Swiss-Prot record:
Region spans: Disordered: 203-300
Positions in coiled-coil regions: 67-179
Keywords: Coiled coil
Domain of life: Bacteria
Organism: Staphylococcus epidermidis (strain ATCC 12228 / FDA PCI 1200)
Protein name per the record: Uncharacterized protein SE_2353
Comp. bias (Low complexity): 203-285
Length: 300
């Protein structure tokens, strides 16, 4: 029975059958050989079907060919001693039993060594499993650290955005304060200008009232001076008229008197001529008094 047909019988792939054959030959199990298309091929027997089925089941359980063979070796003996039937190759020594015993002891040692090797392989598998678990833990921790770092970055970004927003709010508040201060200063300057204009208007009204009072005083002083001048003019006119009448009377009387009396009339006329000069001086006095009054007025 060739490999393809045998694989169909045991419900395995040809690759799995070749793998099992390799492990069996490494462990000293003898399988029948035949020639197929000029090459050596394994000739499977009906007895091999049960053996290969057990090995395949153990491989599925342990997921390892070495572990499967170790467990099966504990249950069954796969190591076969090849004894050929040719008489020419039989040992000539009569101590065949001793040789067989020695061979069995060697086989036992080999089994012990294989058992130790299997234990070492088991330890290696355990270490590999532990390494896988450790790797899983490390990857889990790395993932958690990555998530924590991501959360930290997100929090930092949130803090940074909050700080930027706060700085913008502060800048806006400062701008509002500056605008309020400017408006306050503008209102204060406007109120100050209004108060200054009110003061200026009050000062102008006061100056106007003062000028009006000065004009009133001026008009009153002018009326007084005019009354004084009119009175002085009337007085001077009345005096001149009285003097002229007296002189005319005196001249009419002097016409009837004698020459002796002419001298007296001449002296009398001289006295009358002196009288108008005194009147002219009297007329000049009110003018001087008028000038003195205006001078006093302008000084005030």
């Amino acid at each position: 029975m060739l490999t393809k047909e045998f694989a169909q019988r045991v419900e395995l792939s040809e690759k799995q059958v070749r793998k099992i054959v390799q492990h069996l030959e490494e462990r000293g199990y003898h399988l029948s050989k035949t020639e197929y298309r000029g090459r050596e091929a394994t000739d499977f027997k009906e007895d091999d079907i049960e053996l290969f089925t057990d090995i395949a089941n153990k491989v599925k359980q342990t997921n390892s060919y070495d572990l499967a063979f170790e467990e099966l070796e504990k249950e069954k003996d796969f190591l076969q001693v090849i004894v050929k039937d040719e008489d020419s190759q039989l040992p000539t020594d009569q101590n065949v039993a001793q040789l067989v015993e020695d061979l069995r002891s060697e086989i036992q040692k080999m089994r012990e060594e294989r058992q130790m090797l299997g234990q070492m392989i088991n330890q290696v598998h355990q270490q590999q499993q532990e390494l896988k678990e450790l790797q899983t833990d490390i990857t889990t921790k790395l993932d958690s650290n990555a998530q924590s770092l991501k959360s930290i970055q997100n929090s930092q970004e949130a803090i940074q955005s909050a700080q930027e927003q706060q700085s913008k709010d502060i800048a806006k508040a400062n701008e509002l304060k500056d605008s309020e201060l400017r408006s306050h200063f503008d209102s204060m300057s406007n109120s100050a200008s209004i108060s200054q204009s009110n003061v200026a208007s009050q000062s102008t009204t006061a100056s106007l009232s003062q000028s009006e009072s000065a004009n009133d005083s001026m008009s009153s002083s002018l009326s007084e001076s005019n009354s004084i001048t009119s009175e002085s003019n009337t007085n001077s006119k009345s005096e001149i008229e009285s003097k002229s009448t007296s002189t005319s009377e005196f001249l009419s009387e002097s016409g009837s008197v004698s020459n002796s009396e002419k001298s007296e009339s001449i002296s009398h006329s001289q006295s009358t001529s002196a009288t108008p000069s005194s009147q002219s001086t009297y007329q000049q006095q009110p003018k001087e008094e008028k000038k003195g009054f205006f001078a006093r007025l302008f000084n005030l």
